[in-house]
């Protein structure tokens, strides 16, 4: 076997070369220590250079957000499984603020507030990220809200219209149909999506905060069944998640929407619901030992919602003309809209749709209280056709509610009041809709116009909805030209209005009420009986003709 020999000169040369190329480097890393932890909150000593809202890394790759920056310690919210965080563990700075991945790859997916998929469909490929805490668009970067966003719900589109870039609050007690109203608004965007025109398409984001997992799964199933998941993203922070996730979820949905808005696209975000986000933030603040205020909420709970909802905007044409429309949901107790969180959000938003439990229990669904529901954008967010036919609808319904309450105590009513009550009852019936069945704006315009013309006055109240459905089917066949002329919400001219009434009169001749009676407008002449004839005085004028 050959003997391996290395000369001393070779060894010396190798060492000299190594030492000549070596440059000593030193890195400085701040390390903190967990001093105590409970309920998703950790107090960390050290880390003197940490920034507000900076991401911190706990053992096992678990992240936290630095919220409290005290002189000697940091109060951090743990994002994820906090059960394994223990006293004495090391915590490191990341130097990053919280951000989420964004992009079209999120359409059709269900994610958590960190942007991670939780639907079992694999990873989401995205090269872009967006910080959760970003300044909202300034006044000069916006333009007035004038483009309608159709919800497909007659009562909303006619009386409390929503525009692209608006913030419209949906408020009411639990189990009054708040989520159903917002899901209908998402479903109604399907026709716009199928056009392929980005100026018409609306991408939707549904943010579920503190709901049961089964409820979120039900919403996803409803969207899939109607083919709406292809343009929708669900951000889920169910009740089983930590308070930190519930606090962050709305900001995640808003960040994803802002990314599309600044690309010149249109976005609809549903926050379901912000009451639970406020409760989660209250829990975080109390655990961080922040001083409590009214109803034990921290002093900055108004800022929690205002900085979120101010991101909704209709951008100027110079920035692409994109929009972000927000439908925040707030849950009340015993219809009390004067509580702390409801009044806060009412003052931030551009109007509210108030759903009343009494109306819901009476079968009026959607259970919208017309009296205190309002849109501060108003007719500017309506199409010309809808604006023309719905002008008096709110007033008629408000007068009907008032007269209805009065008639409960009045023993006798005049004919005009009775007619107003009859018309009002039919209008209420006409505005009822089944869940997950939005109505195109053309059908809404036709129905509301014909109701104003008194077409439904002769129809029994119980048959109004069946009459409307069959009438619209018939009009689509016999008056298709009228529908073409008002497509997209254009105004109804005199000739088309006359054609609608004539086609409706023909249909009424064939329609049978549930009791088998006809509903034609003309009152049939009744023959006088013998007694009435006997009491009549008949004057006969005789004329004499002289020869």
Curated annotation (Swiss-Prot):
The keyword RNA-binding does not apply. It is found in: Cell membrane. Coiled coil: none annotated. It catalyses: ATP + H2O + 4 H(+)(in) = ADP + phosphate + 5 H(+)(out). It is a peripheral membrane protein. GO terms for cellular component: plasma membrane; proton-transporting ATP synthase complex. GO terms for molecular function: ADP binding; ATP binding; proton-transporting ATP synthase activity, rotational mechanism. It comes from the Bacteria. SUPFAM superfamilies: C-terminal domain of alpha and beta subunits of F1 ATP synthase (SSF47917), N-terminal domain of alpha and beta subunits of F1 ATP synthase (SSF50615), P-loop containing nucleoside triphosphate hydrolases (SSF52540). The record marks 373 as: Required for activity. PROSITE patterns: ATPASE_ALPHA_BETA (PS00152). ATP binds at residues 172-179. Its EC number is 7.1.2.2. InterPro entries: ATP_synth_asu-like_sf, ATP_synth_asu_C, ATP_synth_asu_C_sf, ATP_synth_F1_a_nt-bd_dom, ATP_synth_F1_asu, ATPase_a/bsu_AS, ATPase_F1/V1/A1_a/bsu_N, ATPase_F1/V1/A1_a/bsu_N_sf. Keywords: ATP synthesis, ATP-binding, Cell membrane, CF(1), Hydrogen ion transport, Ion transport, Membrane, Nucleotide-binding, Translocase, Transport. F-type ATPases have 2 components, CF(1) - the catalytic core - and CF(0) - the membrane proton channel. CF(1) has five subunits: alpha(3), beta(3), gamma(1), delta(1), epsilon(1). CF(0) has three main subunits: a(1), b(2) and c(9-12). The alpha and beta chains form an alternating ring which encloses part of the gamma chain. CF(1) is attached to CF(0) by a central stalk formed by the gamma and epsilon chains, while a peripheral stalk is formed by the delta and b chains. HAMAP family: ATP_synth_alpha_bact. Belongs to the ATPase alpha/beta chains family. Produces ATP from ADP in the presence of a proton gradient across the membrane. The alpha chain is a regulatory subunit. This is ATP synthase subunit alpha. It comes from Rhodococcus opacus (strain B4).
């Amino acid at each position: 076997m050959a003997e391996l020999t290395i000369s001393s000169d070779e060894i010396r040369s190798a060492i000299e070369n190594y030492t000549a190329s070596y440059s000593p480097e030193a890195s400085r890393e701040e390390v903190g220590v967990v001093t105590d932890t409970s309920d998703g909150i950790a107090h960390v000593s050290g880390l003197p250079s940490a920034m507000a809202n900076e991401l911190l890394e706990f053992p096992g790759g678990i992240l936290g957000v630095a919220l409290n920056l005290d002189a000697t310690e940091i109060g951090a919210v743990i994002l994820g499984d906090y059960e394994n965080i223990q006293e004495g563990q090391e915590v490191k700075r990341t130097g990053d603020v919280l951000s989420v991945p964004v992009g079209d790859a999120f359409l059709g997916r269900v994610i958590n507030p960190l942007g991670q998929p939780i639907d079992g469909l694999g990873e989401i490929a995205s090269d872009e990220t967006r910080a959760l805490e970003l300044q909202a668009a300034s006044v000069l970067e916006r333009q007035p809200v004038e483009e309608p966003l159709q919800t497909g719900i007659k009562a909303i589109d006619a009386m409390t219209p929503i525009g692209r870039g608006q913030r419209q609050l949906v408020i009411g007690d639990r189990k009054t149909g708040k989520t159903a109203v917002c899901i209908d608004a998402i479903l109604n965007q399907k026709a716009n999506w199928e056009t392929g025109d980005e100026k018409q398409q609306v991408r939707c984001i549904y943010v579920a905060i503190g709901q049961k997992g089964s409820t979120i799964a039900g919403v996803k199933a409803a969207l899939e069944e109607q083919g709406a998941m292809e343009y929708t993203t669900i951000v889920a922070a169910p009740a089983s998640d930590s308070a930190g996730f519930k606090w962050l979820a709305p900001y995640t949905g808003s960040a994803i929407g802002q990314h599309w808005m600044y690309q010149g696209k249109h976005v609809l975000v549903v926050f379901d619901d912000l009451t639970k986000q406020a409760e989660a933030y209250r829990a975080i603040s109390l655990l961080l030992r922040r001083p409590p205020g009214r109803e034990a909420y921290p002093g900055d709970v108004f800022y929690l919602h205002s900085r979120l909802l101010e991101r909704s905007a209709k951008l100027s044409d110079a920035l692409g003309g994109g929009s972000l429309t927000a439908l925040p949901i707030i849950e009340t107790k015993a219809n009390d809209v004067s509580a702390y969180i409801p009044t806060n959000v009412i003052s931030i938003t551009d109007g509210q749709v108030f759903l009343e439990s009494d109306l819901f229990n009476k079968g009026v669904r959607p259970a919208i209280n017309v009296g205190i529901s309002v849109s501060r954008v108003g007719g500017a967010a309506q199409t010309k056709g809808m604006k023309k036919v719905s002008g008096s609808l709110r007033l008629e319904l408000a007068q009907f509610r008032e007269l209805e309450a009065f008639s409960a105590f009045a023993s006798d009513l005049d004919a005009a009041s009775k007619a107003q009550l009859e018309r009002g009852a039919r209008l209420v019936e006409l505005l009822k809709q089944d869940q997950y069945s939005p109505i195109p704006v053309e059908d809404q315009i036709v129905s509301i116009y014909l109701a104003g013309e008194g077409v439904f006055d002769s129809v029994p109240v119980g048959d109004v909805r069946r009459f409307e459905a069959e009438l619209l089917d018939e009009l689509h066949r016999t008056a298709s030209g009228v529908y073409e002329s008002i497509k997209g919400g254009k105004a109804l001219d005199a000739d088309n209005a006359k054609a609608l009434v004539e086609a409706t009169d023909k249909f009424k001749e064939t329609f049978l009420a549930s009791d088998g009676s006809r509903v034609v407008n003309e009152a049939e002449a009744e023959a006088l009986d013998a007694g009435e004839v006997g009491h009549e005085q008949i004057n006969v004028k005789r004329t004499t003709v002289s020869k």
